[in-house]
Amino acid sequence: MSLPDKAFPVSWDQFHRDARALAWRIAGLDREWRAIVAITRGGLVPAAIICRELGIRLIETVCIASYHDYTSQGEMQVLKGIGASLLENQGEGVIVVDDLTDTGKTAAIVREMMPRAHFATVYAKPKGRPLIDTFVTEVSQDTWIYFPWDMGFTYQEPIAGGKRG
Protein backbone atom coordinates (compact mmCIF):
# COMPACT_ATOMS: atom_id res chain seq x y z
CA MET A 1 0.00 0.00 0.00
CA SER A 2 1.48 3.36 -0.98
CA LEU A 3 1.18 6.49 1.08
CA PRO A 4 -1.38 9.06 -0.08
CA ASP A 5 -0.28 12.61 -0.89
CA LYS A 6 -1.24 13.77 2.60
CA ALA A 7 -0.03 11.19 5.07
CA PHE A 8 0.29 11.75 8.80
CA PRO A 9 2.34 8.94 10.36
CA VAL A 10 2.07 8.84 14.15
CA SER A 11 4.69 7.13 16.33
CA TRP A 12 3.90 5.36 19.60
CA ASP A 13 5.56 8.21 21.51
CA GLN A 14 3.56 10.87 19.68
CA PHE A 15 0.30 8.98 20.13
CA HIS A 16 0.97 8.55 23.85
CA ARG A 17 1.67 12.28 24.23
CA ASP A 18 -1.46 13.18 22.26
CA ALA A 19 -3.66 10.77 24.25
CA ARG A 20 -2.32 12.23 27.51
CA ALA A 21 -3.06 15.73 26.16
CA LEU A 22 -6.62 14.55 25.52
CA ALA A 23 -6.81 13.31 29.12
CA TRP A 24 -5.61 16.74 30.33
CA ARG A 25 -8.36 18.46 28.36
CA ILE A 26 -11.00 16.12 29.74
CA ALA A 27 -9.65 16.53 33.29
CA GLY A 28 -9.97 20.30 32.85
CA LEU A 29 -13.73 19.89 32.46
CA ASP A 30 -13.85 19.09 36.20
CA ARG A 31 -16.61 16.49 35.94
CA GLU A 32 -17.21 13.12 37.54
CA TRP A 33 -16.91 10.26 35.06
CA ARG A 34 -18.45 6.86 35.72
CA ALA A 35 -17.01 4.99 32.74
CA ILE A 36 -15.30 5.08 29.37
CA VAL A 37 -16.68 3.49 26.23
CA ALA A 38 -13.94 2.72 23.71
CA ILE A 39 -14.97 2.55 20.07
CA THR A 40 -13.09 -0.50 18.83
CA ARG A 41 -10.58 -0.98 17.65
CA GLY A 42 -9.02 2.47 17.36
CA GLY A 43 -10.37 3.71 20.69
CA LEU A 44 -8.80 0.93 22.76
CA VAL A 45 -5.32 2.44 23.11
CA PRO A 46 -6.39 6.02 23.92
CA ALA A 47 -9.07 4.68 26.29
CA ALA A 48 -6.44 2.76 28.26
CA ILE A 49 -4.28 5.88 28.56
CA ILE A 50 -7.20 8.15 29.50
CA CYS A 51 -8.50 5.65 32.07
CA ARG A 52 -5.11 5.54 33.71
CA GLU A 53 -4.71 9.33 33.75
CA LEU A 54 -8.23 10.05 35.04
CA GLY A 55 -8.48 7.10 37.45
CA ILE A 56 -11.46 5.54 35.66
CA ARG A 57 -11.83 1.78 36.21
CA LEU A 58 -14.95 0.89 34.23
CA ILE A 59 -14.23 0.37 30.54
CA GLU A 60 -16.80 -0.80 28.00
CA THR A 61 -16.48 -1.24 24.25
CA VAL A 62 -18.72 -0.67 21.28
CA CYS A 63 -17.69 -2.20 17.99
CA ILE A 64 -18.72 -0.49 14.78
CA ALA A 65 -16.99 -1.61 11.61
CA SER A 66 -16.65 0.88 8.80
CA TYR A 67 -13.19 0.47 7.24
CA HIS A 68 -13.34 -3.00 5.74
CA ASP A 69 -10.33 -2.66 3.42
CA TYR A 70 -8.32 0.12 5.16
CA THR A 71 -8.82 2.48 2.21
CA SER A 72 -12.44 3.57 2.11
CA GLN A 73 -15.45 3.50 4.37
CA GLY A 74 -18.05 0.87 3.69
CA GLU A 75 -21.43 0.11 5.22
CA MET A 76 -21.59 0.77 8.97
CA GLN A 77 -22.15 -2.36 11.05
CA VAL A 78 -22.69 -2.48 14.82
CA LEU A 79 -20.90 -5.69 15.78
CA LYS A 80 -21.16 -5.18 19.57
CA GLY A 81 -23.41 -2.77 21.41
CA ILE A 82 -22.99 -1.02 24.78
CA GLY A 83 -24.06 -2.61 28.08
CA ALA A 84 -27.47 -1.51 29.37
CA SER A 85 -26.15 0.03 32.61
CA LEU A 86 -24.10 2.61 30.70
CA LEU A 87 -27.01 3.47 28.42
CA GLU A 88 -28.98 4.67 31.45
CA ASN A 89 -29.46 8.43 31.57
CA GLN A 90 -28.52 8.53 27.88
CA GLY A 91 -24.83 8.06 28.70
CA GLU A 92 -24.51 10.92 31.20
CA GLY A 93 -21.11 10.72 32.93
CA VAL A 94 -19.60 8.49 30.23
CA ILE A 95 -16.69 9.39 27.98
CA VAL A 96 -16.78 7.85 24.51
CA VAL A 97 -13.24 7.56 23.12
CA ASP A 98 -11.90 6.91 19.63
CA ASP A 99 -8.56 7.51 17.96
CA LEU A 100 -10.05 9.58 15.14
CA THR A 101 -13.26 11.03 13.82
CA ASP A 102 -13.21 11.05 10.05
CA THR A 103 -16.65 11.49 8.47
CA GLY A 104 -18.46 11.37 11.82
CA LYS A 105 -20.55 8.36 10.79
CA THR A 106 -19.28 6.16 13.63
CA ALA A 107 -19.69 8.93 16.20
CA ALA A 108 -23.22 9.61 14.95
CA ILE A 109 -24.26 5.99 15.53
CA VAL A 110 -22.82 5.97 19.05
CA ARG A 111 -24.25 9.41 19.82
CA GLU A 112 -27.70 8.04 18.98
CA MET A 113 -27.08 5.37 21.63
CA MET A 114 -25.66 7.82 24.19
CA PRO A 115 -26.71 11.41 23.41
CA ARG A 116 -25.52 12.81 26.77
CA ALA A 117 -22.09 11.14 26.73
CA HIS A 118 -18.91 13.20 26.24
CA PHE A 119 -17.23 12.33 22.93
CA ALA A 120 -13.43 12.58 22.78
CA THR A 121 -10.98 11.72 20.01
CA VAL A 122 -7.26 12.19 19.71
CA TYR A 123 -7.53 13.38 16.09
CA ALA A 124 -10.41 15.00 14.20
CA LYS A 125 -11.18 15.74 10.57
CA PRO A 126 -13.54 18.59 9.61
CA LYS A 127 -16.53 16.43 8.60
CA GLY A 128 -16.59 14.56 11.91
CA ARG A 129 -15.53 17.39 14.19
CA PRO A 130 -19.05 18.75 14.96
CA LEU A 131 -19.90 15.45 16.67
CA ILE A 132 -16.86 15.55 18.98
CA ASP A 133 -16.78 17.43 22.27
CA THR A 134 -13.02 17.26 22.91
CA PHE A 135 -10.09 16.48 20.61
CA VAL A 136 -6.38 17.28 20.41
CA THR A 137 -5.31 17.69 16.78
CA GLU A 138 -7.28 18.52 13.64
CA VAL A 139 -6.06 17.24 10.28
CA SER A 140 -7.46 17.94 6.82
CA GLN A 141 -10.18 15.69 5.44
CA ASP A 142 -7.87 14.30 2.73
CA THR A 143 -5.10 13.31 5.16
CA TRP A 144 -4.67 9.63 6.00
CA ILE A 145 -3.41 9.01 9.54
CA TYR A 146 -1.09 6.03 9.95
CA PHE A 147 -1.34 4.84 13.53
CA PRO A 148 1.59 3.05 15.18
CA TRP A 149 -0.34 -0.23 15.50
CA ASP A 150 -0.76 -0.27 11.71
CA MET A 151 2.93 0.24 10.89
CA GLY A 152 6.29 -1.48 11.16
CA PHE A 153 9.85 -0.42 10.55
CA THR A 154 10.99 -0.44 6.92
CA TYR A 155 13.96 0.84 4.99
CA GLN A 156 13.55 4.43 3.80
CA GLU A 157 15.11 5.45 0.50
CA PRO A 158 17.43 8.48 0.89
CA ILE A 159 15.91 11.80 -0.12
CA ALA A 160 18.58 12.21 -2.79
CA GLY A 161 17.43 8.94 -4.37
CA GLY A 162 20.54 6.98 -3.48
CA LYS A 163 22.94 9.35 -5.28
CA ARG A 164 26.39 9.51 -3.82
CA GLY A 165 27.73 12.89 -3.01
Curated annotation (Swiss-Prot):
The keyword Translocase does not apply. Keywords: Cell inner membrane, Cell membrane, Glycosyltransferase, Magnesium, Membrane, Metal-binding, Purine salvage, Transferase. This is Xanthine-guanine phosphoribosyltransferase. Its EC number is 2.4.2.-, 2.4.2.22. InterPro entries: PRibTrfase_dom, PRTase-like, Xanthine_Guanine_PRibTrfase. 5-phospho-alpha-D-ribose 1-diphosphate binds at residues 41-42, 98-106. Belongs to the purine/pyrimidine phosphoribosyltransferase family. XGPT subfamily. HAMAP family: XGPRT. SUPFAM superfamilies: PRTase-like (SSF53271). Homotetramer. The keyword Phosphoprotein does not apply. Its main location: membrane. Its cofactor is Mg(2+). GMP binds at residues 102-106, 144-145. It is an enzyme of class 2 (transferase). Purine salvage pathway enzyme that catalyzes the transfer of the ribosyl-5-phosphate group from 5-phospho-alpha-D-ribose 1-diphosphate (PRPP) to the N9 position of the 6-oxopurines guanine and xanthine to form the corresponding ribonucleotides GMP (guanosine 5'-monophosphate) and XMP (xanthosine 5'-monophosphate), with the release of PPi. To a lesser extent, also acts on hypoxanthine. Mg(2+) binds at residue 99. Xanthine binds at residues 102, 145. It is a peripheral membrane protein. Pathway: Purine metabolism; GMP biosynthesis via salvage pathway; GMP from guanine: step 1/1; Purine metabolism; XMP biosynthesis via salvage pathway; XMP from xanthine: step 1/1. One of its GO terms (biological process) is GMP salvage. Guanine binds at residues 102, 145. GO terms for molecular function: guanine phosphoribosyltransferase activity; hypoxanthine phosphoribosyltransferase activity; magnesium ion binding; xanthine phosphoribosyltransferase activity. It catalyses: GMP + diphosphate = guanine + 5-phospho-alpha-D-ribose 1-diphosphate; XMP + diphosphate = xanthine + 5-phospho-alpha-D-ribose 1-diphosphate; IMP + diphosphate = hypoxanthine + 5-phospho-alpha-D-ribose 1-diphosphate. It is found in: Cell inner membrane. GO terms for cellular component: plasma membrane.
